[in-house]
Amino acid sequence: MKVTLLNKEEVKNFYKTWGLFACKCYNTNPKFAEKVGKSCHKTRHYSGSRSFYFNFLIEDVPRSAMDQLARHEQGVVKNIQSQRYTDSSNLDWYVPKVIKKHPDLLEAWTNGFESDSADYQYIIEQLKKLEGFTGEKAREVARGRVGMDIYSSATFGFTIEALEHLMHKRLCYRSQEAIRELAKLIKEEIVDVLPELSTYLVPECLAVGYCNENKMQCKELKDSVIPTKEQFDIIKNSKEYKDMVLQLKKKKLA
């Protein structure tokens, strides 16, 4: 699995670009553009950021994870490797960590994908012989024989809102292994260029302070100080919570 940020130089100037777009709202001097961009992000005023995309080359990702990534729509552009226009006969496949732990399971997994690959090539050969199908015409039929975890590649672009949403959902411990691993790689690529974004690209529970999964909250956080949404709704209506918030506001005003 490999992720490459394609527009690193543009990402370095992300906040300035955002600010230049947003400065018009208050007729702010463009020399303050970077400061404006950061302020807009902190206050979640995203309209000026939506012309900017973080663009990635994503390689050797299981097709199952690619399908999950493609479900993200708002603020996302994508171009995914076609199994009709490209040959899948020599592609490798993803192996989950739990499968790697057990030799018998690994053997069954490997044998299955090797069989898929052999059947794929056989179907293409026979379709040419029996029907005269070649190239994409044969592959559009044979692709149904490849496994869901065969590797695929794509290019994706995300606005900052879309990236944050992606991380909220896919860095969650309840997300599947492969898509969570992919989300981590995407975050690493961005943070390597613009470290300030690290605190925004987090699981949803860390962003909002509670877990929307409620009874299905992950075992990693069940005993943590992060409440479920149902628990938080009770907490926020308590006298203790309201008193604490008012005290904090008074301290800030003092």
Model regions: which residues?
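Family-specific signature for flavin-dependent thymidylate synthase
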Residues: M1-A254
